[in-house]
Each structure stands twice: as structure tokens, then as C-alpha cells.
């Protein structure tokens, strides 16, 4: 009878004894291919939990936790939440047929972490009408406020373009940029030994872009570079 093998990550077949973390419900297993191996949890069924939001959240958190713990031991190729195979043979056949692709990806991310730099626009202060201010004075203050607002947004847009161009030029294929309504996110693939340099770069960028708040996240497995 087929048994689901919920799969967390692929990596080079280890030549040392791994310390496997606990899974979502039970123990994890190491499935070794010729050159690429996988960590799996047997018997996990997403279908039985898809209508239970609390259970799904628990599974998502377990998925991320396992990948983070594995990545502290070696370079891993993190798989998307919900990845599973119907049998060990199906998993091994998949690994063998995609071995070169996965090897290339592992070589690209070896010894590196992913950092997310959130760039959040600062807000323009609202114009408050002071008590006792007559109509003409308020009109002039309002006109001045809109001129300042215009200059503020122009500077903000200029700084945004500067950030995007500089990070794209510096990191090239090691940067993924996502623009959202309320912020811009830069996903950066950085060598583990260059964390201090990255922090210095972010501090320097913050000084050059005073109309934005720059927030650097913690190092994570390279989810966006697989």
C-alpha cells in the first residue's frame, strides 16, 4: 500500500551522521540517492488537514523549522510546503532524473544564506491647522505643505530608484526584488561569512535613503533561489 513521503529538503548525500530534528507528527527519515538525498516524514497527508486552519499553520511552522535546523548542518535545497511523494521508489526516481539540476542549484547556494531587506516608505506628516490661524495664513501654510509634500515624494522615488539600481548591480542574480503596495522587498543571497559586510552596507544605504526605513531580517535558507 502506498505511503506518503512528505519531503522537506534535498541535499548532497552526507558522509557524516546527521542529527535529524523531529517532524510535524513523528520521526524523520533520511532517504539516500546516489548523490542527492532527501529528508522525509512518512504518513503525512495534507488532504486530511486542508480544512483545519490550525493544523495547516502547525504544519507550515514545522516545515520551516525542520528546514532551518537542517540548514545549520549543511547546504540544503528547501522544498515548498506540501511537497510529497507516494513511495520511496517514486522519490528516488525523481531524485535521479533531476540529479544534475539539483546539483547545480546546491552548488549555487553552497555556504550562503538568504536575507530579506524590507524597505518601507516613511509617511509625510499631516498638516495641522493651528487654532487662531486666519484663512489667508492657513492657505499659505497649506500651499507650502503641498510643495514640501511634492519634494518629499520626489526624493523618495529617487532614493527608491537608487536602491534598486545599486542592489541589482551589486548582487545581480543573487538579488530578487519584489515591489508591494506598502514596501519593497529585496531577497539577497549572501555568503555566510559576509554578514558583517551586509550590515555595514545596510547602514550606509539607510543614511543615503533617509525617506525610507530599511529593516534587515534574520538569515534563512535560500527559499527564493531554488
What spans do the regions from the language model cover?
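An interfacial alpha-helical scaffold signature
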Residues: 1-215, 219-226
Amino acid at each position: 500500500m502506498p505511503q506518503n513521503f512528505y519531503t522537506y529538503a534535498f541535499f548532497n548525500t552526507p558522509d557524516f551522521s546527521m542529527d535529524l530534528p523531529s517532524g510535524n507528527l513523528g520521526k524523520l527519515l533520511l532517504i539516500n540517492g546516489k548523490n542527492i538525498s532527501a529528508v522525509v516524514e512518512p504518513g503525512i497527508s495534507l488532504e486530511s488537514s486542508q480544512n483545519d486552519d490550525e493544523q495547516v499553520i502547525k504544519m507550515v511552522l514545522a516545515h520551516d523549522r525542520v528546514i532551518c535546523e537542517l540548514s545549520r548542518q549543511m547546504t540544503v535545497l528547501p522544498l515548498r510546503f506540501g511537497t510529497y511523494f507516494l513511495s520511496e521508489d517514486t522519490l528516488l526516481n525523481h531524485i535521479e532524473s533531476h540529479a544534475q539540476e539539483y546539483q547545480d542549484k546546491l552548488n549555487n547556494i553552497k555556504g550562503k544564506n538568504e536575507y530579506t531587506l524590507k524597505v518601507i516608505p516613511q509617511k509625510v506628516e499631516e498638516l495641522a491647522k493651528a487654532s487662531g490661524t486666519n484663512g489667508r495664513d492657513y492657505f499659505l501654510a497649506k500651499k507650502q505643505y503641498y510643495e514640501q509634500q511634492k519634494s518629499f515624494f520626489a526624493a523618495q522615488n529617487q532614493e527608491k530608484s537608487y536602491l534598486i539600481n545599486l542592489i541589482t548591480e551589486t548582487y545581480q542574480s543573487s538579488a530578487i526584488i519584489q515591489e508591494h503596495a506598502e514596501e519593497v522587498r529585496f531577497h539577497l543571497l549572501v555568503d555566510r561569512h559576509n554578514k558583517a559586510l551586509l550590515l555595514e552596507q545596510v547602514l550606509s544605504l539607510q543614511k543615503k535613503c533617509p525617506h525610507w526605513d530599511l529593516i534587515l531580517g534574520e538569515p534563512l535558507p535560500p527559499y527564493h533561489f531554488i
